């Protein structure tokens, strides 16, 4: 796992992400790139996969229209998807990739997808977080 962890750290630094926290033993990074809307993105290096999770908002009052809109938007997301956490109240962006052949382009594509999603869908996200 040390090799994968080091590779991921190299990708993050090469893409100018700010590493807030890292724990090699647990395989966890917490990163941000606020100019792209990414804050407290959790990246888990868990051989054989890497997991990206970005908290988006909390659903205060579950609403059919919110869930419908999120599922419809999932179809447009290039990499990753909206998911709910175990409580069913927190909306998270999540993506997973295989570590074995992970390259910088794949890694960056997930981060670009998240950034694009946050910029294109920000008005909806803000509105949903008010419910």
Regions found by a protein language model. Name each.
Residues 51-90, 96:
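Short, internal acidic amphipathic alpha-helical interface segments
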Residues 34-58:
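Long, continuous compositionally biased terminal/linker segments
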Residues 119-125:
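C-terminal partner/receptor-binding element of secreted or periplasmic proteins
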Residues 116:
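Long, contiguous binding/interaction regions
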Residues 1-38, 76, 83-85:
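Charge-rich, low-complexity N-terminal segments
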Residues 83-113:
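A short, solvent-exposed beta-edge/loop patch
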Residues 126-131:
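Short, highly charged C-terminal tails/helix-capping segments
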Residues 25-27, 48, 89:
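Beta-strand-connecting loop/turn residues
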């Amino acid at each position: 796992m040390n090799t994968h962890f080091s590779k991921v750290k190299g990708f993050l630094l090469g893409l100018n992400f700010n590493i807030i926290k890292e724990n090699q033993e647990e395989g966890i990074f917490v990163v941000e790139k606020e100019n792209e809307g990414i804050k407290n993105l959790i990246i888990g290096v868990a051989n054989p996969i890497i997991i990206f999770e970005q908290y988006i908002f909390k659903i205060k009052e579950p609403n059919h229209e919110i869930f419908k809109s999120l599922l419809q938007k999932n179809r447009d997301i290039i990499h990753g998807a909206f998911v709910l956490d175990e409580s069913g109240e927190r909306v998270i962006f999540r993506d997973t990739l295989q570590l074995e052949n992970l390259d910088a382009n794949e890694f960056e594509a997930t981060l670009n997808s998240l950034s694009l999603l946050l910029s294109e869908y920000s008005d909806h996200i803000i509105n949903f977080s008010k419910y």
